[in-house]
Amino acid sequence: MRVYAAITLVLVANTAYIGVEAWGGLFNRFSPEMLSNLGYGGHGSYMNRPGLLQEGYDGIYGEGAEPTEEPCYERKCMYNDHCCPGSICMNFNGVTGTCVSDFGMTQGELCRRDSDCETGLMCAEMSGHEECAMSSECDISRGLCCQLQRRHRQAPRKVCSYFKDPLVCIGPVATDQIKSVIQYTSGEKRITGQGNRLFKRMPFA
């Protein structure tokens, strides 16, 4: 009789243990799968996925965010095989030459000097509302920096735009290099120069 009671007790305890494990699995409040997009747990964090604001993040902020040198630009060569695809080896004097672009850069491509561009194009800083990746690509002397622009029913994009606060810019911005003040049209001057004239007209003010 004691043997049956002991076996029954072991079976009840075993089923109770399995039941508790199952209930805990159903009603566990924290699950890393539910919060994987916030970086909790090992099921994929926000750093593994390129999000909207994390594009091009190199792990550095502020200083040292200058663009890295391209390994193919002006590389020393002897044959075209030593250059990257889209480049050819030009021997100007002697045996060794330098790798240059096969075709000139078109509008919107990054260049370093005027000779990199196609005929009729000049290499210049980006003007306003052109797409960018970092503020160093925009013309800071005109007061432009790279900003994330969101518009209704459009995908967000990074463009060179005028700024007042350097905190809205992507990447470091040297505000002391701004040479020109933003020029407003006459209508904008009139609207912004009024100040609080509306409140002065009110009879109760």
Curated annotation (Swiss-Prot):
Residues in the signal sequence: 1-15
Domain of life: Eukaryota
Expressing tissues: Expressed throughout the nervous system (at protein level).
Gene Ontology cellular-component terms listed: extracellular region
GO biological process: neuropeptide signaling pathway
Keyword terms, alphabetized: Cleavage on pair of basic residues, Neuropeptide, Secreted, Signal
Cellular compartment(s): Secreted
Propeptide: 16-188, 202-205
This protein's name: ITG-like peptide
Native species: Camponotus floridanus
Lineage per the UniProt record: Eukaryota, Metazoa, Ecdysozoa, Arthropoda, Hexapoda
